[in-house]
Amino acid sequence: MRRSFGMVFAIVLVTGCQGSEVVSAPEGLMRIGTGNAGGVYAVYGEGMAEAVRENFARVTTEVVASDGSVENITMVTLGKVEVGFALADVAADAVAGRPPFTEPQPIVALANLYENYVQLVVRDHGPVKSLQDLSGRRISVGSRASGTAVVAERILNVAGLGNDVIRRNLDIKMSARALAESEIDAFFWSGGLPSDAITQLMHGTDVRLIDLKEVAQPLIRAHGELYTETTVPASVYGLSSAVTTVSVPNYLVVGRDMPLTKAYWLTRLLFDEQQKLAQTHPEGHHLDQWTAIRTYPLELHEGAARWYRSVHR
């Protein structure tokens, strides 16, 4: 029989640098910054919130929709949410104080969750057959405060298209609708696989993904090895073949000042409730105790680090 953390694990002994310490079950508010409806952040965040509600009677949860990574980090640092999803490239800019951030942001990580895949979506019989065909075209580069917008601009610049496209800042659902209605010629999306909005788009519109092999290595050389050249498997969306793209890890980020109790239990909850999270979205299967600690350049929150040490002994 399944048991609740709130009832069974009221306290736990954790071995730290100063010996055994008592970590009590959390209480208070847990607001989760997610992302666009139709994306994985929104689905994963709802699953996390449900897991918290089921296990911690004294924690009140709220799922906060957002533009994505940039807005989530901003909300964490302003105390508008306690935890948020963020792409590793955006998180790296945040702690370094690089644009779009004006100064270093005091964030740390609980886990590396899964990989986001850059997806450049076009109509199957439309005018865009390759990345270079975007020249002069109307494209959505994602919501303004999103990780999609960051990587889309980097790809366009690496491809020499930075000044040659007509940009629109649309979220994933609006992008899909605009493409279906021929209001745009293409849209960028950085998300897990599959992304619901793209799956739904494919049910009523003939679309495909553009191969990004030509910019994969130049992007990595220009912006670092947080990016990886990879493929979107054909099976994910029923494509005719796999499509080369770039991926970047997703981190679960919190403020440095998050209480140790909350950080410890939320990290533990991710793993103890992994099966349920994976039922919420397949990306939940990719959580792993060893890859989860790879959150460069973010430090792990001490509460998260203590939980990982307890299972890695």
Model-derived segments and spans:
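C-terminal motif of bacterial Sec signal peptides marking the signal peptidase cleavage site
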Residues: 13-16
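Bilobed "Venus flytrap"/periplasmic-binding protein-like clamshell domains
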Residues: 27-55, 59-60, 115-181, 275, ...
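Extracytoplasmic
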Residues: 27, 56-58, 68-71, 78, ...
